[in-house]
């Protein structure tokens, strides 16, 4: 399951590669994207508690000859899937036009009139580190998160941490202030996070985690609703949207399960500072 997920991620990244940086044609990248989608479906089937799997092992085996002969494959793809990469890097100013369906797993709807959250304690954000010659600092602007029940979240905020492969903190943990507003299926933050370590000093395999938390009045505690993460090879200037995973937060990235099949993401914008 984990290997299927990993392979899917690598294929998704290759499918998104700019033409100049890829050895594949656009048609081949489309096929690679479809294979990645199938791997995600297989991973989801393995994690499903239902007896009937949506994507069987026999189906998975049909992909092997396609992947082995990707440079010469010119037949119709055996499965009706779309090559939609889970991580889509948006061009500056590009707008998303996504239709949101109701999620079967969680009740309630987030659509409604724009609303603002009350002023609260301003989180635990830290200032940018001093610059060093030849070293790169990263600012991540958390713009918004897409959730079907965004309108029902009380006092939502995001905890940001940087972990190594063993889940050990590499920098101080930071909490954003409570979100600035909610609108339709989005919770808006528009807040900058200053990474508390130069990018070049991060260990291999490190990842930046974003845990979305909200208050549950019935249980009287703050709960993690979902999380997302960004790996080191995804540190690039500009916008990026990353997928959301079900809690509990898996800092070791070994048993990941998508929050929903719907097009709901965490929207970020990265700025690199180098002397």
From Swiss-Prot:
Q: Which GO terms describe its cellular component?
A: membrane
Gene Ontology biological process terms, A to Z: determination of ventral identity; dorsal/ventral pattern formation; negative regulation of JNK cascade; negative regulation of protein-containing complex assembly
Gene3D superfamilies assigned: Axin interactor, dorsalization-associated protein, N-terminal domain (1.20.120.360), C2 domain (2.60.40.150)
* PROSITE patterns registered for this protein in UniProt: C2_AIDA
**Where in this protein does the record say Phosphoserine is found?**
113
- Show the segment(s) annotated as Disordered: 97-125
**Keyword Disulfide bond on entry:** no
Domain annotation C2 Aida-type: ranges: 126-273
Q: Which UniProt keywords apply?
A: Developmental protein, Phosphoprotein
* Protein task: Acts as a ventralizing factor during embryogenesis. Inhibits axin-mediated JNK activation by binding axin and disrupting axin homodimerization. This in turn antagonizes a Wnt/beta-catenin-independent dorsalization pathway activated by AXIN/JNK-signaling.
The organism of origin for this protein: Macaca fascicularis (Crab-eating macaque)
The record lists the lineage as: Eukaryota, Metazoa, Chordata, Craniata, Vertebrata
The highest taxon in the source lineage is: Eukaryota
PANTHER family (UniProt xref): AXIN INTERACTOR, DORSALIZATION-ASSOCIATED PROTEIN
- UniProt similarity note: Belongs to the AIDA family.
Outline the segment boundaries, as ranges, of region: Axin-binding.
Answer: 123-190
Where is composition skewed (Acidic residues) in this entry? 97-107
Protein name (database record): Axin interactor, dorsalization-associated protein
């Amino acid at each position: 399951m984990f290997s299927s997920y990993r392979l899917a991620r690598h294929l998704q990244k290759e499918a998104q590669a700019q033409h100049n940086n890829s050895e594949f044609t656009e048609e081949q990248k489309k096929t690679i994207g479809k294979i990645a989608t199938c791997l995600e479906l297989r991973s989801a089937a393995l994690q499903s508690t239902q007896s009937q799997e949506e994507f069987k092992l026999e189906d998975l085996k049909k992909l092997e000859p396609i992947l082995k002969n990707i440079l010469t494959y010119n037949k119709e793809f055996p499965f009706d899937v779309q090559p939609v990469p889970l991580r889509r890097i948006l061009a500056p100013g590009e707008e998303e036009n996504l239709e949101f369906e109701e999620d079967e797993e969680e009740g309630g709807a987030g659509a409604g009139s724009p609303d603002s959250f009350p002023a609260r304690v301003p989180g635990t954000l830290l200032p940018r580190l001093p610059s060093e010659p030849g070293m790169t600092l990263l600012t991540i602007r958390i713009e918004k998160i897409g959730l079907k029940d965004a309108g029902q979240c009380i006092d939502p905020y995001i905890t940001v941490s940087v972990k190594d492969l063993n889940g050990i903190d590499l920098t101080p943990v930071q909490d954003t202030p409570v979100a600035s507003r909610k609108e339709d299926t989005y919770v808006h933050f528009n807040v900058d996070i200053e990474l508390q370590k130069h990018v070049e000093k991060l260990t291999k395999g490190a990842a930046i985690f974003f845990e979305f938390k909200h208050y549950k009045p019935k249980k009287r505690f703050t709960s993690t609703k979902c999380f997302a993460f960004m790996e080191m090879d995804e540190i690039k200037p500009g916008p990026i949207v990353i997928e959301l995973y079900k809690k509990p937060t898996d800092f070791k990235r070994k048993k990941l399960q998508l929050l929903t099949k719907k097009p709901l993401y965490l929207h970020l914008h990265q700025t690199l500072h180098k002397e």
